[in-house]
């Protein structure tokens, strides 16, 4: 099968991908965007977004992504369902395989594949997604003002999330599997000195319960030991802070990544080390992971693609 040739290929359909499509379409780059397995990305699992400028009453993640999608289509972006399964960025035009069969040859590529939150693997995690389970305290913490929440994890991210939530919630339980925190000393100190945070060392979360949302977590203290204890803890929100996995595997042979797989770009730009290949959104952002920062880098990537093609 002969490869399809395009000027600008965008891989991923969260705020980064859709914003890149809007800007690329307006620049007459005739962008083709493949939406992946979850059109709209992780934001479609967020019930309410209240921190994106321009939505004074808030908006659901699903509706925001649908609006961005329509806006991209309005300017002529070609949006398609399909997943990038292989990549050859060794030379231009760059070859991207979709669903293991169709090959696209692109003069420029914008990687906006995002990063997936790591889950514990509990049967109830997906059931309560958007109904008490979250992987982003900055995104969803506002909904738990004066409520009781639990954060799972023992590293810097977990401590940062717990500290942030302590400024909103009435009580924060930090559930730590090990008998110690892995976080930096300054973050450990911040957590241990916060009266609102109670650290539950040597605890495992093994399940969630609730009728119309999370009402509590099933815990095991000192799992596997002779004095193992099982009990339930009433909470209103359950925050996962055990890391994210960037969706960058197929690009790793060609672009630089950090030790966890986030694509490295030139500081202040979405440019990777491969000319004409750009990374936008959470796949290149281990720090902020916000809709607005993802959209901003999507814009930057499209502008860079336009400039690259002009030159």
Each language-model region and where it sits:
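Glycine/small-residue-rich loop that forms an oxyanion/phosphate-binding "nest" at active or ligand-binding sites
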Residues: 79-142
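Internal hydrophobic alpha-helix adjacent to the cofactor/substrate pocket in enzyme cavities
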Residues: 163, 167-171, 292-311
């Amino acid at each position: 099968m002969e490869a399809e040739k395009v000027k600008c290929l965008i891989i991923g359909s969260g705020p980064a991908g859709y914003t890149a499509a809007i800007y690329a379409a307006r620049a007459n780059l005739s962008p083709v965007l493949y939406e992946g397995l979850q059109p709209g990305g992780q934001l479609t699992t967020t019930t309410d977004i209240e921190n994106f400028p321009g939505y004074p009453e808030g908006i659901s993640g699903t509706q925001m992504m649908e609006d961005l999608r329509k806006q991209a289509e309005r300017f002529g972006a070609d949006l398609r369902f399909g997943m990038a399964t292989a990549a050859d960025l060794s030379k231009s035009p760059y070859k991207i395989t979709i669903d293991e069969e169709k090959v696209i040859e692109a003069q420029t590529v914008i990687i906006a594949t995002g990063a997936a939150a790591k889950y514990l693997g509990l049967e109830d995690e997906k059931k309560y997604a958007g109904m008490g389970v979250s992987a982003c305290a900055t995104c969803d913490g506002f909904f738990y003002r004066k409520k009781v929440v639990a954060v799972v994890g023992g590293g810097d991210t977990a401590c940062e999330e717990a500290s942030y939530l302590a400024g909103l919630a009435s009580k924060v339980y930090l559930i730590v599997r090990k008998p110690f925190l892995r976080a930096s000393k300054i973050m450990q100190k911040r957590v241990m000195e916060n009266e609102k945070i109670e650290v539950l060392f040597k605890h495992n979360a093994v399940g969630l319960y609730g009728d119309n949302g999370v009402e509590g977590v099933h815990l095991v203290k000192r799992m596997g030991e002779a004095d193992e204890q099982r009990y339930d803890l009433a909470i209103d929100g359950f925050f996962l802070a055990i890391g994210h996995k960037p969706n960058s595997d197929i690009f790793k042979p060609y672009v630089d990544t950090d030790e966890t797989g986030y694509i490295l770009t030139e500081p202040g730009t979405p440019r990777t080390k491969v000319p004409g290949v750009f990374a936008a959104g959470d796949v290149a952002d281990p720090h902020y992971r916000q809709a607005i920062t993802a959209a901003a880098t999507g814009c930057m990537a499209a502008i860079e693609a336009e400039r690259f093609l002009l030159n």
